[in-house]
């Protein structure tokens, strides 16, 4: 489903898009024309009054940076200290919590062995094979309730990973395909194989993902939502 249509004055394929920390807004930037629009994804873009926010860019970026740093700092404190020291925190992309904050996707910054029983695990937990020997530059998911740790893949094959809201699944880009994977590293599937902008993939809900793509070869790029099951 197309989220924004072109108009005589606006061709969205000429814009770059940046999502806010909570993924509820998009900053659309046309660097050639030096125009910036802040779009809300809570209402259809076509019904919004577009206002150039170029004069407020510094404030917007500082606010988003503060939001990101505050959120990450707070959530990092919920992790066992043994994991905190192993996570690469130079980018928000490297550490992401699931919607319920019970699981964390993280990029290991060094080889290490993750000791067992960092927390007291419940009587019943996942029986999938764990990976507690960490390799640098590999993504893992740690379950804060079960004390389980699963390998997702190396950062060279897991590009732009993100949690799907209200699920235990992640999306990522691999070999020009948009894929989904369970938090325990199982059940990889391709959900979109056509041309799309790899840097703009945003899981919007448990059954919907926003991407920047073209409906057919030669058409202008635009924002679309795709349904997933």
Language model features with spans:
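Sequence signature of WD/YWTD-type beta-propeller architectures
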Residues: 1-229
């Amino acid at each position: 489903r197309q989220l924004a249509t072109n108009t005589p004055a606006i061709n969205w394929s000429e814009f770059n898009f940046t999502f806010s920390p909570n993924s509820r807004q998009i900053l659309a930037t046309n660097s050639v024309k030096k125009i910036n629009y802040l779009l809300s994804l809570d209402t259809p873009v076509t019904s919004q009054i577009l206002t150039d926010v170029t004069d407020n860019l510094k404030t917007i970026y500082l606010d988003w940076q503060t939001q990101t740093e505050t959120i990450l700092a707070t959530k990092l404190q919920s992790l066992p200290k043994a994991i905190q020291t192993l996570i690469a925190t130079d980018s928000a992309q490297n550490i992401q919590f699931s919607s319920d904050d019970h699981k964390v996707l993280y990029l290991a910054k060094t080889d290490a062995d993750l000791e067992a029983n960092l927390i007291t695990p419940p009587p019943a937990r996942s029986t999938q094979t764990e990976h507690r020997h960490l390799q640098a530059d590999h993504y893992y998911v740690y379950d804060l309730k079960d004390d389980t740790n699963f390998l997702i893949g190396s950062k060279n094959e897991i590009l732009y990973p993100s949690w799907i809201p209200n699920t235990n699944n992640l999306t990522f880009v691999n070999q020009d395909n948009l894929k989904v994977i369970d938090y325990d590293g199982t059940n990889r599937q391709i959900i979109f194989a056509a041309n799309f902008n790899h840097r703009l993939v945003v899981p919007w809900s448990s059954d919907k993902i926003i991407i920047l793509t073209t409906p057919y070869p030669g058409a202008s790029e635009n924002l679309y939502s795709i349904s997933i099951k």
